């Protein structure tokens, strides 16, 4: 049996890209000695990244015909016509020529709607367009409608659906009527690029960005839902109390950076706030190592990667209270609406005993999640074996 993983994102996509890399590495290891496994990517830049992780990949591009199939997929009349005409797009024909039995889309995507006959594994990271539909990134440009159509048409067809948590799996089942046995919660893991061997040393990184140790660190792209503003409001409160702490934001602009910059200027925070922009993977470990604590008051979840990475590096974590299921006792959990609560949590991180307790709890929580991942991997392998048995029933 042969599986083919499809990677459509690149490093500029943020944390989701690292999770996609983890998914590829995980499936490669599960398939070793059991099944054939290939990786195809739509981004040439991924070839070198994957090679550095000992994964061989090939680049491809969706054809105009493939994109047309994807464009037509929302139309209720299209699929019956496609079946009647036996139309199979170039993407699926290419996969069949390669002997592919099961396609693994390692990021959320509407591309499974291109497939006429091949089975696939889908990925869902969140349902935040339903949880918090007021944010512009899911409210504007028909994103909400596109996600709803994608999930309603793709998920019922999937052989398996990879999610990041039991909470998300339950929400998918409840909202879209998906059978629970089709869903497989697979906990996230820290980014593979955070290993010391592939990272630039802390001193070099801090010098590069002009940072002094002891800042609060938020690795997140500038989306509205990332809630950078609440951190800045907390800085204003702390400054009024005579505590001028600093924060470093690392992430590309997704339309909300100017809003953050305007607030920084209006509240005289330029000396306390560093906007680092997109940071290459090899610098991330050094930025984590140099911080006092990681702060993440995001509205989107139910899980995120920076908490895992804070625990891996051994840093205290301040996290949104609605995602306590991921954090357990390993974070100071605050209401992301409440700047005062966030300021108090940041102030608490000046206490070495509190920080040490959070670091110990983080290490323990990471071990728990790693055990959950091992159990989920065993379940994934069992499901692949079930698919293999069924796949033997046709040529």
What does each model-found stretch correspond to?
Residues 1-395:
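Carbohydrate transferase catalytic cores enriched for Leloir-type hexosyltransferases
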